[in-house]
Amino acid sequence: MSDESPATLRRIAEEGARLAGRVLAERFQGERTIEYKGGIDLVTDADRAAEAAVLGFIRQHYPGHAILAEESGASKGSGLRWIVDPLDGTTNYAHRVPHFCVSVGVEGPDGVLAGAIYAPMMDELFSAARGEGATLNGRPMRVSGTTELGHSLLCTGFPYDVHERPEGPVGLLKRFIVRAQGMRRTGSAALDLAYVAAGRFDGFFEFGLKPWDVAAGSLLVQEAGGTMVRIDGAPFQVGIGDVLACAPGLASQLISESRGFLADIGWVPPAPRA
């Protein structure tokens, strides 16, 4: 396939995400093999099966494109790069908590061009193409109009090294939990970003994310009219692991609070990941 327009890339991302989502849904109640990649970082046989399904589909349409996937790593190619998380929310999935998703994004030299996030247990497909807006199951979606931090519902997550380095994620959680209306921790960063884009959450922040966690979701937020930045307010790029996404009416308040906290702990921006 030679068509690399954002609209076509979006359609391929959507179809690939749905394909992987069906694999996950079919295996959800069955037996599964669970392995530990780190202290609290899991991988299941369903992750690998879903990844094989979506990568095979992408390669059918764009055999020359590069791919970065959570389980199989990077494969070189020319032109665009697909960034795939076949199962975001693996711990939820392993415990049969039905809150997880597939995330498929594709980026060019100037950033993400298209992306899709599919939550199979709810049959919700969030997608976006650059310059064409964001949708939920085909209907346009927008970030919330919330402008007061005290009226906001925020969400966050914890990186896999939170046991060794809790000061950032736990400290910022403490700072916001007493200022927001409510706080949630769902276990899927990609879905958290999709929920910000859909106006369900007013803001999201997290440390230590990988490109496959944020590629598709960042475009959803931006195309839905939201703010997507590094956690200190600097410009966002896919390789940045410490991020903040929110409704535009909350951006200055959240960034100000975040900067104050980061200064207190002596935070140093990590180098962007490839």
Regions found by a protein language model. Give the residues of each.
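N-terminal subdomain of lithium-sensitive/metallo-dependent phosphomonoesterases centered on the IMPase/IPPase/PAP
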Residues: M1-L87, G249, I265-A274
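Oxyanion/phosphate-interacting regions
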Residues: M1-R11, E15, G171-V178, L191-A274
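Residue-level signal for inorganic ion chemistry
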Residues: A20, L24, D47, I58, ...
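Residue-level detector of anion-binding/catalytic polar loops
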Residues: V23, G64-A66, P140, G182, ...
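A short, compositionally biased
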Residues: Q29, F100, A128-E132, Q222, ...
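Conserved beta-strand termini and adjacent loop/short-helix elements that scaffold enzyme active sites
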Residues: K37, E70, T186-S188, I231
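Glycine-rich active-site/cofactor-binding loop and its immediate structural neighborhood
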Residues: S78-M122
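Acidic beta-strand-loop-alpha-helix segment within the catalytic core
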Residues: G105-L193, I240-A274
